């Protein structure tokens, strides 16, 4: 009977497999409880993309990009878990990020479902940037020729072409090739009529709390999730989540 709002990389639960998904749904039905996953990415950025789509008469493609120099995120385990530090040519590297971040695929599936798209497949692609010299980040070392940046893309495809793309571009420092430019935030682009571009980023990149930015979309969703029907719910099934009761009127 306990409603759950989580930022633990959970959107639809499909990554857990059919058997575990059925267990969750059955438990939710018995307890009349709901479970919802949110955060920034996956999370609020996909809601922004869906809301932006309402301004279009025709949509050819929606792209969501997270692009950042993540050197300040001092978690060697996280980076090593998605392939950083391995040789660029390591045949096992491409599958690491896909296995470690299944909720990004779930987010694409959620958007496709919300837009009523008959998706044929969700494709995963990745490319790497190699360190141009030995790099010591303080919390991990990356040897020359090893992975120091990656670009991933999960794309929902209809009639053989990508109609929704979720892209990630992460790098650790600037001693890498290719040295991709980054946006230091999130960018939503819609190709269509009209074509749109939305940028969501901290005004002062070095002075914000990423944990707070991740938590608040979940906190603001609590009331809506408690009122939702039992089971796994996604953003398109809830009312618009806003920052109610947060405006400083003093």
Regions found by a protein language model. Give the residues of each.
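Active-site-lining helix/loop region of Rossmann-like oxidoreductase modules
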Residues: 54-188, 202, 208
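Gly/Ser/Thr-rich loops at beta-strand to alpha-helix junctions
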Residues: 11-17, 40-45, 69
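Rossmann-fold NAD(P)-binding glycine/threonine-rich loop
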Residues: 3, 8-34
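Alpha-helical support elements that line or immediately flank enzyme active sites
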Residues: 43-55
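Structural motif
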Residues: 7, 36-38, 65
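Conserved active-site and cofactor/substrate-binding residues in soluble primary-metabolism enzymes
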Residues: 19, 23, 43-44, 98-106, ...
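C-terminal helical cap and adjacent loop that interface with cofactors, partners, or active-site loops
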Residues: 175-250
């Amino acid at each position: 009977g306990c409603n759950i709002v989580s930022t633990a990389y959970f959107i639809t639960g499909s990554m857990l497999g059919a058997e575990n998904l059925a267990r969750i749904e059955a438990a939710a039905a018995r307890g009349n409880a709901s479970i919802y996953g949110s955060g920034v990415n996956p999370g609020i950025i996909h809601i922004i993309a869906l809301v932006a789509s309402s301004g279009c008469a025709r949509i050819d493609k929606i792209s969501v990009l997270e692009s950042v120099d993540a050197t300040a995120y001092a978690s060697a385990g996280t980076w090593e878990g998605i392939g950083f530090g391995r040789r660029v040519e390591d045949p096992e590297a491409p599958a690491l990020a896909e296995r470690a971040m299944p909720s990004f695929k779930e987010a694409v599936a959620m958007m496709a479902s919300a837009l009523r798209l008959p998706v044929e497949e969700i494709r995963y692609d990745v490319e790497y940037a190699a360190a141009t010299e030995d790099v010591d980040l303080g919390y991990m070392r990356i040897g020359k020729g090893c992975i120091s940046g990656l670009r991933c893309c999960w794309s929902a495809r209809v009639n053989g072409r990508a109609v929704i793309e979720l892209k990630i571009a992460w790098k650790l420092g600037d001693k890498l090739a290719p040295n991709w430019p980054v946006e230091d935030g999130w960018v939503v682009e819609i190709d269509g009529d009209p074509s749109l571009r939305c940028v969501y980023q901290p005004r002062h990149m070095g002075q914000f709390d990423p944990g707070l930015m991740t938590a608040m979309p979940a906190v603001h969703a609590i009331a809506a999730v408690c009122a939702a029907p039992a089971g796994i719910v996604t953003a398109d099934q809830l009312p618009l989540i806003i920052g109610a009761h947060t405006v400083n009127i003093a």
